[in-house]
């Protein structure tokens, strides 16, 4: 028994500590015991590593689940917002439908119908402006022509035309206006019957002016057309007697205008107009200015007028000796007249007037009053 125990004690005595390590180290003699102890230590380390990996996996999984839950929680909020917007749209459509439904009510339609009826009636009472303007022009031309007619046989023809005009006016419905026109025509007829004297012609001129004013107030369109036809016939009768202006001249408000097709300086243009018993144009009214400006701008021609400051610099005067009216200053183009390089004569330029040197060649415009021109 003692022999068997002693070797064990000796084997145990062989164990020694290695002072350089924190664990127990076995020498080669105890190799078998060292191997068993190392196996247990590595097994413990592996167990701890697996536990750490599992914890990391659970953490990641929990993070993913939280993210999914956050996204899912947002869906009901978005759906709720869309639902509220749809409810608001539906409510607006409901109100709009109710408002539209009220538009078709009979009372509303009747109100609209009444408004349209009143508008239609008002429009129906308006005179036909183009016809009245044409009548005005016809009367203006007639007035100018009557002033030059001395022959009694021709005046009898006028008398007949005016008699027909009186009969047509006599059928018009508005009594107060018709009485006024009838009186005017009666005096006109009496004046025409005595025509040869110049004073009588002036009286006819006045009567026609008053008749023109009275005709401008007539509302009945059918009667206006009848009067218009009578005046057309009267115009035709006058045109058989004479022309208002010579060939190649243009008639406007009792005057004849010649727009040249060649060019001369200002002084020679004055002479050219005098040679045809006319005058380099002198403008007397805004209507005449607009008419002439339109003619020159359409043809895109710079044209002389009878205006200059040759007598005194800065004092503009027409060729008939009359001064330039202050109200006509607005017709100068912007910055004109500027007297740049002795510019003493006026021309039509673009949409207004310009001062230019008098020795420049331009087109020119002559003017003279209407007379009776017979065809040879």
From Swiss-Prot:
Alphabetically ordered keywords of this record: Adaptive immunity, Calcium, Disulfide bond, Endocytosis, Glycoprotein, Immunity, Innate immunity, Lectin, Mannose-binding, Membrane, Metal-binding, Receptor, Repeat, Signal-anchor, Transmembrane, Transmembrane helix
Query: For the motif Endocytosis signal, what are the positions?
Result: 14-15
Query: Would I find Protein transport among this entry's keywords?
Result: no
Read off the Gene3D superfamilies from this record. Answer: Mannose-Binding Protein A, subunit A (3.10.100.10)
User: So which stretches are on the Extracellular side?
Assistant: 71-376
**PROSITE patterns in UniProt:** C_TYPE_LECTIN_1, C_TYPE_LECTIN_2
Q: Provide the binding site for Ca(2+).
A: 336, 338, 340, 343, 354-355
Family annotation (Pfam families): Lectin_C (PF00059)
Q: Does the keyword Transmembrane apply?
A: yes
One of the GO BP terms on file: immune response
Single GO cellular component term: external side of plasma membrane
Disulphide-bridged cysteine pairs: 242-372, 245-256, 273-366, 345-358
The cross-references to SMART domains, in alphabetical order and at most eight, read:
CLECT (SM00034)
Name the InterPro entries for this protein. Answer: C-type_lectin-like, C-type_lectin-like/link_sf, C-type_lectin/snaclec_domain, C-type_lectin_CS, CD209-like_CTLD, CTDL_fold
Function text: Probable pathogen-recognition receptor involved in peripheral immune surveillance in liver. May mediate the endocytosis of pathogens which are subsequently degraded in lysosomal compartments. Probably recognizes in a calcium-dependent manner high mannose N-linked oligosaccharides in a variety of pathogen antigens. Is a receptor for ICAM3, probably by binding to mannose-like carbohydrates.
Subunit composition and interactions = Homotetramer.
Q: What is this protein called?
A: C-type lectin domain family 4 member M
Which source organism does the UniProt entry give? Gorilla gorilla gorilla (Western lowland gorilla)
Gene responsible for this protein: CLEC4M
